Amino acid sequence: MGSKEDAGKGCPAAGGVSSFTIQSILGGGPSEAPREPVGWPARKRSLSVSSEEEEPDDGWKAPACFCPDQHGPKEQGPKHHPPIPFPCLGTPKGSGGSGPGGLERTPFLSPSHSDFKEEKERLLPAGSPSPGSERPRDGGAERQAGAAKKKTRTVFSRSQVYQLESTFDMKRYLSSSERACLASSLQLTETQVKTWFQNRRNKWKRQLSAELEAANMAHASAQTLVSMPLVFRDSSLLRVPVPRSLAFPAPLYYPGSNLSALPLYNLYNKLDY
């Protein structure tokens, strides 16, 4: 009963149709039930209503009823919105080039990439190389600049070397005015003269250190003891080899003897043992 009474609420039915009451279902006398106030939303009818119930016409609606039509006007089919194209989605494999509705799919290219490509083509003039192709050229230019920056060794003539050596023998260090005067006389730059004197001073210092080392070695060898022949009581001689360079260079003379003057080392070599 309750479900049937609830189903009767809603928009007023068509003319001549009574509300869903026991009398109307049992076929009682025609009587009109009080109408429900206008404006209440219609409830959906239950599926358990008897087949004897008469449903009002779908197209009829009270002029003052603003309740939504649950069944709606005659089923016109679902409304289809036009498909929204997605340019970022490419055409899947095995499908045609056009999507539903005859819309052509665009290749997989985001709008930002396409805009960037168009902007780059617009900014770069026709025939100009791309930035990627300029990098190897820049590297080659840097290599050439590095090769050009290498200092080349200055080749001096014999007259220039002689004049520089003479000046160096007189003075190891030159003042700025002397260096400028010497450079102008030799047709050289002050930098070249300065570099030559620096190299010459380094060479001179190396020569001094080598000569000093050689002198120290000679002095150490001169201080070594020299062994001479020794005479023992039994008149036996002990010969010790002595270098000839360390023997006395001057001859020895014996007074009152007729022996010719002989150096000591010659006498030493002629002795019999």
UniProtKB/Swiss-Prot annotation:
Predominant location category: nucleus
Biased composition (Basic and acidic residues): 114-123
Cross-referenced PROSITE patterns: HOMEOBOX_1 (PS00027), HOMEOBOX_2 (PS50071)
Biased composition (Gly residues): 93-102
Gene: HMX2
GO molecular function: DNA-binding transcription factor activity, RNA polymerase II-specific; RNA polymerase II transcription regulatory region sequence-specific DNA binding; sequence-specific double-stranded DNA binding
Organism field: Homo sapiens
Residues annotated to bind DNA: 149-208
Protein name: Homeobox protein HMX2
GO CC, alphabetical: chromatin; nucleus
